[in-house]
């Protein structure tokens, strides 16, 4: 049988545990000003080098999201030297953001093609990049690439996915948690509840819904 939400109230959670979870989320997402206010209000100890690290990561993400992926790559190498050399997937994705910017801003197709040939094509020696390369190169065939079958590559969602991966990689490179504590808690809760639902499926219980669980 499912767990009665009222039973949650029987589990005591210390304030400092909640504070640590909130702080983890704020630091992970580079909310510098909010971190300063939160630390001041709660009396928590600020993590070492926390503010400087957030400021540097925030600059990198800003450049990547605003269309200056080459600057983001440069700053990433300064902050986490060797990261992109060892993480080819991430390096490819960042380079692809610059290519997309050339396409989106209607730069001369020759410039976009030359960039692709010099920076992206070498990845084609590895099979897993071939299909991605074909998708990116196909954008050049359309006068309005946003109407092409690969339009999703031009979206802010794609940029955000790359930035999220970059954030996790930079944090891991610095031996820091690559996921915010709240994200890990939600992942764990979802997996556990899905397993419970499967075990009790014979009782006709509905599949676990995270959205419904958070409303309970």
Q: Which functions belong to the PLM regions below?
A:
Residues 1-48, 53-83:
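Short, charge-rich, low-complexity alpha-helical interaction segments
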Residues 56-59, 63, 67-70, 75-216:
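Extended acidic/polar alpha-helical scaffold segments
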């Amino acid at each position: 049988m499912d767990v009665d939400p009222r039973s949650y109230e029987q589990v005591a959670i210390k304030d400092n545990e909640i504070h640590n979870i909130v702080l983890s989320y704020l630091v992970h997402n580079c909310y510098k000003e909010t971190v300063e206010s939160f630390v001041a209000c709660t009396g928590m100890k600020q993590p070492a080098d926390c503010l400087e690290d957030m400021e540097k990561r925030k600059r990198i993400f800003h450049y990547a999201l605003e269309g200056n992926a080459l600057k983001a790559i440069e700053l990433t190498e300064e902050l986490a030297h060797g990261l992109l050399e060892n993480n080819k997937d991430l390096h490819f994705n960042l380079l692809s953001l610059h290519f997309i910017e050339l396409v989106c801003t209607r730069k001369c197709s020759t410039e976009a093609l030359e960039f692709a040939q010099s920076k992206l094509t070498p990845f084609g020696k590895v099979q897993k990049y071939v299909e991605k390369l074909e998708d990116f190169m196909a954008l050049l065939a359309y006068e309005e690439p946003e109407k092409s079958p690969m339009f999703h590559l031009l979206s802010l969602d794609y940029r955000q996915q790359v930035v999220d991966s970059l954030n996790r990689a930079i944090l891991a490179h610095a031996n820091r948690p690559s996921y915010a504590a709240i994200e890990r808690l939600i992942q764990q809760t979802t997996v556990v509840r899905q397993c419970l639902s499967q075990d009790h499926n014979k009782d006709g219980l509905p599949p676990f819904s995270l959205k419904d669980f958070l409303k309970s």
